[in-house]
Amino acid sequence: MEIPKLLYIAVIAIGLSGSLTCATPLANPWGDPEAEANPEAKATAEATAEAIAEALAEPEPALPALPLLMFLFTLPALQHWIEKNWING
């Protein structure tokens, strides 16, 4: 089963959200011009934005779970055929 791309994006965004909040210093919430943001947090935010943009740019495969769904829909018919021909013979 394929995991949706949006789930990967959500995990990356949630995992890095702690470092993203460090980009604005909490000691000065009004944005003092002399206060420098953390360069590591800025780099992390840029990398996260780039990863999300790349993930959204890739085309999504059309119906990746279709073979699995087809198999699951045929299971009752297979069960009926096995019971009719092999078990109740």
From Swiss-Prot:
Residues 1-22 form the signal peptide. GO terms for molecular function: sodium channel regulator activity; toxin activity. GO terms for cellular component: extracellular region. It is found in: Secreted. Residues 23-61 form a propeptide. Keywords: Amidation, Ion channel impairing toxin, Neurotoxin, Secreted, Signal, Toxin, Voltage-gated sodium channel impairing toxin. Negative results: shows low activity at hNav1.8/SCN10A (EC(50)=2.6 uM) and hNav1.9/SCN11A (EC(50)<1 uM). Does not exhibit hemolytic and cytotoxic activities on HEK293 cells. This is Myrmicitoxin(1)-Pm2a.
